[in-house]
Curated annotation (Swiss-Prot):
Subcellular location: Cytoplasm
Oligomeric form and interacting partners: The 20S proteasome core is composed of 14 alpha and 14 beta subunits that assemble into four stacked heptameric rings, resulting in a barrel-shaped structure. The two inner rings, each composed of seven catalytic beta subunits, are sandwiched by two outer rings, each composed of seven alpha subunits. The catalytic chamber with the active sites is on the inside of the barrel. Has a gated structure, the ends of the cylinder being occluded by the N-termini of the alpha-subunits. Is capped at one or both ends by the proteasome regulatory ATPase, PAN.
Membership in a protein family: Belongs to the peptidase T1B family.
Keyword flag Transmembrane helix: no
Organism: Nitrosopumilus maritimus (strain SCM1)
Enzyme's top EC category: hydrolase
Official protein name in the record: Proteasome subunit beta 1
GO BP of this protein: proteasome-mediated ubiquitin-dependent protein catabolic process
Amino acid sequence: MSMYMPGATAVGITFDGGVVFASEKRIAFGNFLVSKTTKKTFPITPKVGATCAGLVADMQILSLQIAALAKIRKMELKRDVPPNTVAKMMSNMMYERRYFPLLTQVIVGGVVDKPIMYTLDPLGSVLPDEYAAVGTGAEMALGVLDPQFKPNMTKDEAIDLAKRAVRAASLRDSASGDGVDVLVITKDGTEEFTEEIK
């Protein structure tokens, strides 16, 4: 972790009928703990959401701009904007800023036809996956996700796995911690809640 690139841990998991995002709540710059209550999960549309690691301010701006573009696109298409379209819009915006990049890693996903998820780096490359982890705690989170993820999990199994992955990273990564924010997206809409890390 560099002095000006804060650490974080964020994960995303697809399950049978939706996607779940989880992130911890800490922001630290170098040795300084800036915040213990930062939200790093973002609903973009009622059917698409995202989570991030890196500069949260950059992700806040990106999510607001993409949410506005998605509303315009929905009015043009007269139907829900699918996750791959949202991921591509994010990718385009991040690539346009490649010389002054948005310093954030993003997991974006949702469900319109079927659950799908993508990981984006600060330059906008789009990588599809069934589950993902980003940030300084990604290695620890993937140590939980890799052996325990299975396709077509139930909603409760996916939420539990996401929380355990973030918890494992928070216990070993000094830049992660102070609670878990969870965002669940299904065809019925979004659900958000916060839990302490125990």
